[in-house]
Amino acid sequence: MANHLLEEMVDALSSLPGIGRKSAFRISFHLLRLEQGHFNHFIHQLTNTKNKIKFCKRCGSYAETEICNICTSEKRDTHTFCVVEQPEDIFFIENTREFHGKYHVLNGVISPLEGIGPKDLRIKELLERIEPEQIKEVLVATNPTLEGDATADYLASQLKPLSVDVTRIAYGITVGGSIELADQYTLGRAIRSRLQL
């Protein structure tokens, strides 16, 4: 490509997760066609959000203040925690409108191959919240990967001595999915997580 500035813009956009080069080109061309005022507003919003969003000092989620809205809400179930890998996982769980407790973000999972152990995660902070916040149940919502499962097992071993119910989100066949298309791991997990009817 002859235009180096455009190429640099495409490279920057395609470094974002889920955006390939083709999408990066489309976004770049769209941004170049924007009216200058609209473009400036877009850039201002990106910069403003990046500068003002921080991490909640209590749960580790994204927040505009020291403590996020979920942690300060009096409408939430204060005795139930949902433990997630990353702050963005909270957004997806909240969209289900099924969980009404509070959260705790680990900032990753145990991964010996990547040199990440329990001390590299926010597990100590989780354990320190249990007694003062009178937590009765911890729902572990790590991803259904080997690392996510190892992290869930480790959390259970640390939490059970504290007289806390430790639960795990169920995994299985996608609604509308087919057993023949499910991989062996997912199908096995669905069988182990079966429910009483």
From Swiss-Prot:
Pfam families associated with the record: RecR_HhH, RecR_ZnF, Toprim_4
Keywords, alphabetical: DNA damage, DNA recombination, DNA repair, Metal-binding, Zinc, Zinc-finger
Domain named Toprim: residues: 79-174
UniProt GO BP: DNA recombination; DNA repair
Domain of life the protein comes from: Bacteria
Family, per entry: Belongs to the RecR family.
Chain's role: May play a role in DNA repair. It seems to be involved in an RecBC-independent recombinational process of DNA repair. It may act with RecF and RecO.
Name of the protein: Recombination protein RecR
Species this protein is from: Leptospira borgpetersenii serovar Hardjo-bovis (strain JB197)
